[in-house]
Amino acid sequence: MFIKICGIKTPNELKIIEKYGDFTGVILECVSKRKIGVESAKNLIEISNIPVFAVSTTTEVLAWKNIIELTGTNYLQMHSNIDSKSVEAIKKEYGCFIMKSFKIPEKSEFPEIDAENIILDIERYEVDRILLDTGKGCGMVHDHRISQIIAKKFDIVLAGGLNTDNVSEIIKKVKPFGVDVSSGVENKNSKDEGLIKKFYENVKSVKL
């Protein structure tokens, strides 16, 4: 199962994540305690032995172009309402692997209806991977009844409040293609190898 451990800030964190993650990510152009500068991101991307997503909430095509050209990344993770034509233009010009986030509410009165509306939104985009999240790295769990429905139609990456205690049961319920974690493997705002190792083991223990 695809494991992405996001929000790295230092080469030391990267070294830890390379032992357990298939992908990682650097936070740029958004409000986040994990945000780093372009030069730091470029350095992490250059030295990494695993793919590094450049993660941002920007809706501006020019901002994404700057991220690509200044960091050298081939992987983008979009956490915004950027329109589908802009995504298409970026992909056509740069050929990047794009993972687009779609927001899932924390609680839903009508999960089937919410799922269908989100599916319609997803179908507007030509992207390489679909990420279902509670919203912009807030670390909150969303209504998995919705993501469970969507996961039956698409290979989704699941994010939002995942940690060592809940990831196994959530995977069994939703059956995602992969998982994306950040705050759930942190201690005092830094990536914790013990938590990352436990998270990895709990993910790999699930047989779908």
From Swiss-Prot:
SS bond list: none
Keyword Amino-acid biosynthesis set for record: yes
GO MF terms held by the record: phosphoribosylanthranilate isomerase activity
Pathway: Amino-acid biosynthesis; L-tryptophan biosynthesis; L-tryptophan from chorismate: step 3/5
Keywords in alphabetical order: Amino-acid biosynthesis, Aromatic amino acid biosynthesis, Isomerase, Tryptophan biosynthesis
A biological process from GO: L-tryptophan biosynthetic process
EC number(s) recorded for this UniProt protein: 5.3.1.24
SUPFAM superfamilies attached to this UniProt entry: Ribulose-phoshate binding barrel (SSF51366)
CDD domains for this protein: PRAI (cd00405)
Catalytic activity: N-(5-phospho-beta-D-ribosyl)anthranilate = 1-(2-carboxyphenylamino)-1-deoxy-D-ribulose 5-phosphate
PANTHER family: N-(5'-PHOSPHORIBOSYL)ANTHRANILATE ISOMERASE (PTHR42894:SF1)
Family (UniProt): Belongs to the TrpF family.
UniProt name for this protein: N-(5'-phosphoribosyl)anthranilate isomerase
